[in-house]
A protein has these predicted regions:
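N-terminal ordered "arm"
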Residues: 1-54
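Conserved aromatic-histidine-acidic binding/catalytic patches
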Residues: 3-11, 48, 112, 144-155, ...
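Short, hydrophobic/amphipathic alpha-helical patches that form generic packing surfaces
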Residues: 13-24, 93-97, 161-165, 260-267
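Charged, alpha-helical interface segments at or near domain boundaries
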Residues: 35-129
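Internal, well-folded beta-alpha domain core
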Residues: 104-200, 211
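Long, compositionally biased intrinsically disordered terminal regions
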Residues: 171, 182-183, 209-214, 240-305
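Intrinsically disordered, low-complexity terminal tails and inter-domain linkers enriched
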Residues: 199-248
């Protein structure tokens, strides 16, 4: 009978699942690793729940780095962001193979697990790169830059890391509308964090946020050693914009003048005789256009294909 370990959907949860499989003493060929939120019950399998543990995940990560390579760990990290519900088991099988063959594992593309990890890593990396190029920010009247994305994979942190380096002094929010979470960057503190469970209503409150009001609370909090998510002590202060603001009725601006100017420029430089929608869709797929300024008024049916 197969034993299925059910883990969380993030990297820590998956690596903890790998650790628990090895620690169980069961035959590895009789074990599978699946995501707890997405698995389908099987009458002929027994199930074990995995509780995410950063210490266990760290041990697996260190082993992968030393035995396989830093590149192997990078591919695993990106594969964990893929949309596939089977990603946890592919990562387990990839690590199992890597612990046996070491650094040469990355070149064994004839192996199904290696090939799948390679494909997932490439797909996630390509989408993150595309969003870096295609993301559009709008300036709210509070001075915050707001960008919205609709990625197929969970690439918000990869994209946010780029913009944290690109706009280090700006206050901005990058919102993943598909997963209802956002990256919040506070320019005065020079750091950013991921907030879960952010709704469209929260984004409306952000339009009334004055960043200067919250900076005093942030200045006393400790900066993290590495760029990335804010430590727990600072998360409540930095995120209270999404929790403590009241939804006062205020008059919304008539429109973004620069957005209208950009749309006009985009339309005016087009050469009708050279118009090639098929080529344009190849270079800029329709799924990326939902929040791109110059395409915001295009037909809804075309946008959602």
């Amino acid at each position: 009978m197969k034993t299925v370990f059910l883990c969380g959907s993030n990297l820590d949860g998956i690596l903890t699942g790998v650790y628990d499989i090895y620690a169980s003493g069961l035959s590895l060929s009789e074990c599978r690793l699946e995501l707890e939120a997405e698995y389908e019950p099987d009458l002929f399998s027994q199930y074990r729940s995995v509780t995410a543990d950063s210490e266990k995940a760290g041990k697996v990560a260190a082993k992968v780095r030393s035995r396989m390579s830093d590149l192997a760990y990078l591919r695993i990290s990106r594969a964990a962001l893929h949309k596939s519900p089977a990603r946890a088991d592919w990562i387990f099988r990839f690590i199992r193979l890597g612990l046996r063959y070491g650094k040469q594992t990355l070149h064994m593309l004839q192996n199904e697990a290696v090939y799948e990890i390679f494909q997932m890593d490439r797909y996630v990396g390509n989408e993150a790169h595309a969003l870096v190029e295609f993301t559009r920010f709008q300036s709210l009247k509070s001075g915050i830059l707001l960008g919205k994305v609709w990625p197929e994979n969970d690439v918000l942190e990869l994209v946010a890391a780029h913009f944290a380096d690109r706009f280090p002094d700006a206050d901005w929010v990058l919102y993943d509308d598909r997963r209802k979470k956002a990256a919040l960057h506070e320019g005065a503190a020079g750091r950013w964090q991921i907030r879960q469970g952010v709704t469209d209503g929260d984004l409306e409150l952000l339009k009334r946020w004055e960043p200067k009001e919250d900076r005093k609370a942030l200045e006393g909090s400790r900066k993290p050693e590495k760029a990335g998510a804010v430590p727990e002590a600072g998360m409540e202060d930095a995120g209270k914009v999404l929790e403590d603001r009241t939804a006062e009725e205020t008059k919304e601006p008539s429109g973004d003048v620069y957005a209208e100017l950009w749309k006009t420029f985009f339309a005016s430089i087009a050469i009708e005789e050279r118009r090639n929608p098929k080529c344009q869709r190849n270079m800029l797929p329709l799924r990326y256009r939902k929040y791109i300024t110059e395409f915001c008024e295009m037909d809804q049916t075309m946008r959602n294909r």
